[in-house]
Design a protein with these regions (language model features):
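Catalytic cores of histone-lysine modification enzymes
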Residues: 13-119, 174-175
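C-terminal SET catalytic tail plus cysteine-rich post-SET Zn-binding segment of SAM-dependent SET-domain
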Residues: 2-12, 17, 112, 117-176
């Protein structure tokens, strides 16, 4: 395959975001009372820990960046999934399996406070990644995955975020 120009990549990502937004409306219940969101341009490239999600434009504090989308699972279905690292528990009875290719929000990496610049925001059964700080174009989008996930999956290997202090007992912190 040949190289794709930056302009074409941007166009693809914008189309991908629109496609993902449309697909999320089809598979996410309880969305009729939510306004349509115009998501920010984001890029996937090598980041802090593997692939990462990066701002393709300046993003202001409080703006919704992207929606975390995927297959909606009930509690029993989610408990049977053993191969996905992209499960996002919305509530006790609903989980989103974000391992689908068109969910580029899954590339937002973890950061311990205060290094994160985004947070998850759950509204009417949908999960959005929202800026908690101004984010400049080119900055990696990072948020705290939460204590349970960090203790189970990140702490045993050592957290690789840039934070000086890790509240979840992460060991083997790798400084950048």
């Amino acid at each position: 395959m040949g190289k794709t120009s930056k302009a074409k990549q941007s166009k693809i990502l914008r189309q991908g975001s629109k496609k993902a937004e449309t697909l999320s409306k089809k598979i996410s219940p309880n969305t009729k009372n939510l306004p349509d969101h115009h998501f920010k341009l984001v890029k996937v490239k090598r980041g802090l820990d593997g692939l990462g999600l990066f701002a393709g434009e300046d993003i202001k504090k409080g703006e919704i960046i992207i929606e975390y989308i995927g297959t909606i699972l009930n509690k029993e279905e989610a408990e049977k999934v053993t191969t996905s690292m992209y499960l996002f528990e919305v509530n006790r009875n609903k989980t989103i399996d974000g391992s689908v290719r068109w969910n580029i929000a899954r590339y937002a990496n973890h950061a311990c406070d205060p290094e994160g610049n985004a947070e998850s925001d759950i509204k009417k059964g949908r999960v959005f990644i929202k800026a908690i700080k101004n984010i400049k174009e080119g900055d990696e989008i990072l948020y705290d995955y939460g204590e349970e996930f960090v203790k189970e999956y990140i702490a045993p290997k050592g957290c690789r975020c840039r934070a000086v202090k890790h509240d979840y007992g992460a060991k083997g912190h790798v400084s950048k």
